[in-house]
């Protein structure tokens, strides 16, 4: 009976966090709109080999993540949930691996369930795991590789070892097809400390080549197909997307070495109070083979991405699966022997919730700011934000009422965030970051447009996905589409600011021409260097400028 209650509880937890509220959140640009449109175009064109964005070649990532996203939109439709279905599925599969691996390491069902709940309730896992980017996919393949390598090294027969290494190669191959060669570097770096401390070099050298073979065979069919269709894909993807992004001085998303320290701290909420003890206990018990293995998979990728020039919070998502297992193991030890860390965790959650309540007031219409984040007519959004932090503080307090029994309710601290964040986004944010909001407000003007031009790739992708058309033209700025626009067959998909007046004269009689521009809030649109328009509609950061045939 207790098992049934646990099962019902975990399904209710998943529904409240990962299923029910997802459709209430509009897609964010540039990331979610980009991946939504790439997958929509894949379904519309039937081309499952070469990724395209706005009808242009888009070589920033390989294909596997787009496949999963496309299946999500195929199953659930071109809606907010359909766009995010793939990442949610990947996150839940990763959680299932956490359950299985924890159970295999410690043979404790309660610990396995706790590790799963901790993983799914970690702030960074929830934030990225419900956000349509490719990182939850690569995190799944890396965690699957972590499990596969352990299976291989614990097997007692050559068949078991061979199967484990072959499976490892498949996970690495799918990782390469999802986000590139990092899927090879991270597993190698993560297993080396464990192999060294356990002196298991012999098995690695005898069977490791099987992983190499299965990895190559996994990538080969699509790798050859894309090379035949687009011979310069691999050169661009390797040099620009790997070397320049991570290693060179002009790397994208440059950040200092310590960048991930605050990410780890914030990402570990609502279990932050357990983090120091979990890492310390793991290090103290490093003679235990499983603990060393989990520590290695937590720390080595973190060090690798810290050394890299380019950094984003999403890069270290895979570190939180082994960390969740360490947190769960330490939590049960603390509950049994010394609940001080559990009390500290409760107070941290109370402090976080109270701080959020105060911060919400400061930036609300009734606070001291001259330009509040929310306007007076958005008061319901302020109350939603207050509810988010109030629930966080409440469950933090509840864990302290009988800490030995109630500490696990910290998993419910983000419940308000999950249910209400979609209703609390200020209009001023939505108008700049949610193209869907803009499209809904200007649907009648946009729909009949013969040509639509915009100066933002993220907005262009949002317009394309919402309007179900891939012929959006870039205006003034090429952004990440620069490479695709250089192809001869992309001629006419970009109009510079200097060319716009002549281009407008040439195409005006063909139908309505709509220009969608991103502007500063205090920018005077009358000062824009464009021909006089027939209609102008402004939504804070986005402006619709329309020209009708004469």
Curated annotation (Swiss-Prot):
Its main location: membrane. It is found in: Cell inner membrane. The chain crosses the membrane at residues 7-27, 81-101, 111-133, 137-154, 165-185, 204-224, 255-275, 288-308, 315-335, 346-366, 382-402, 406-426. It catalyses: 4-amino-4-deoxy-alpha-L-arabinopyranosyl di-trans,octa-cis-undecaprenyl phosphate + lipid IVA = lipid IIA + di-trans,octa-cis-undecaprenyl phosphate. One of its GO terms (biological process) is response to iron(III) ion. Pathway: Lipopolysaccharide metabolism; 4-amino-4-deoxy-beta-L-arabinose-lipid A biosynthesis. GO terms for molecular function: 4-amino-4-deoxy-L-arabinose transferase activity; mannosyltransferase activity. GO terms for cellular component: plasma membrane. InterPro entries: ArnT_tfrase, Glyco_trans_39/83, LipidA_mod_glycosyltrf_83. Belongs to the glycosyltransferase 83 family. NCBIfam families: PRK13279.1. Catalyzes the transfer of the L-Ara4N moiety of the glycolipid undecaprenyl phosphate-alpha-L-Ara4N to lipid A. The modified arabinose is attached to lipid A and is required for resistance to polymyxin and cationic antimicrobial peptides. This is Undecaprenyl phosphate-alpha-4-amino-4-deoxy-L-arabinose arabinosyl transferase.
């Amino acid at each position: 009976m207790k098992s049934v209650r646990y099962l019902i509880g975990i399904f209710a937890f998943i529904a409240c966090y990962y299923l029910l509220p997802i459709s209430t959140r509009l897609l964010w640009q540039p990331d979610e709109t980009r991946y939504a449109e790439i997958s929509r175009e894949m379904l519309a064109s039937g081309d499952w080999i070469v990724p395209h964005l706005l009808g242009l070649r888009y070589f920033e990532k390989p294909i596997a993540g787009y496949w999963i996203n496309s299946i999500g939109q195929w199953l659930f439709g071109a809606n907010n949930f359909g766009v995010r279905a793939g990442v949610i599925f990947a996150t839940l599969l990763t959680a299932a691996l956490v359950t299985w691996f924890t159970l295999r390491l410690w043979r404790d069902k309660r610990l396995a369930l706790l590790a799963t709940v901790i993983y799914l309730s970690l702030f960074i896992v929830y934030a990225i795991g419900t956000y349509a980017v490719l990182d939850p996919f690569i995190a799944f393949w890396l965690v699957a590789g972590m499990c596969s390598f352990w299976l291989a090294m614990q097997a007692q027969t050559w068949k078991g070892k061979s199967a484990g290494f072959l499976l490892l190669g498949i996970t690495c191959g799918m990782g390469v097809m999802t986000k590139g060669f990092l899927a090879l570097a991270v597993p190698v770096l993560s297993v080396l400390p464990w192999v060294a401390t356990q002196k298991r070099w012999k098995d690695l050298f005898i069977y490791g080549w099987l992983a190499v073979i299965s990895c190559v065979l996994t990538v080969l069919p699509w790798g050859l197909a894309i090379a035949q269709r687009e011979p310069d894909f691999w050169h661009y993807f390797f040099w620009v997307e790997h070397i320049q992004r991570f290693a060179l001085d002009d790397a994208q998303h440059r950040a200092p070495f310590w960048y991930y320290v605050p990410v780890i701290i914030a990402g570990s909420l609502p279990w932050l109070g357990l983090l120091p003890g979990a890492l310390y206990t793991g290090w103290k018990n490093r003679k235990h083979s499983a603990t060393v293995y989990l520590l290695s998979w937590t720390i080595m990728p973190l060090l690798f991405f810290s050394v890299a020039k380019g950094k984003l919070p999403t890069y270290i998502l895979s570190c939180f699966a082994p960390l969740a297992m360490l947190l769960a193991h330490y939590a049960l030890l603390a509950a049994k022997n010394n609940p001080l860390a559990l009390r500290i965790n409760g107070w941290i959650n109370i402090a976080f919730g109270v701080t959020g309540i105060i911060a919400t007031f400061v930036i609300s219409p009734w606070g001291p700011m001259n330009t509040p984040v929310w306007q007076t007519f958005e008061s319901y959004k302020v109350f939603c934000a207050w509810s988010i932090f109030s629930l966080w503080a409440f469950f933090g307090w509840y864990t302290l009422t009988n800490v030995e029994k109630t500490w696990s309710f910290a998993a419910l601290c983000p419940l308000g965030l999950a249910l209400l964040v979609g209703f609390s986004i200020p209009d001023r944010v939505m108008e700049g970051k949610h193209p869907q909001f803009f499209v809904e407000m200007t649907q009648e003007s946009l729909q009949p447009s013969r040509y639509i031009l915009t100066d933002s790739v993220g907005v262009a992708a949002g317009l394309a996905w919402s309007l179900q058309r891939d012929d959006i033209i870039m205006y003034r700025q090429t952004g990440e589409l620069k490479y695709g626009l250089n192809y001869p067959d992309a001629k006419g998909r970009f109009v510079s600011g200097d060319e716009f007046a002549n281009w407008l004269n040439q195409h005006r009689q063909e139908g309505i021409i709509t220009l969608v521009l991103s502007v500063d809030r205090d920018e005077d649109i009358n000062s824009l260097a464009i021909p006089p328009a027939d209609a102008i509609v402004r939504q804070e950061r986005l402006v619709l400028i329309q020209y009708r045939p004469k």
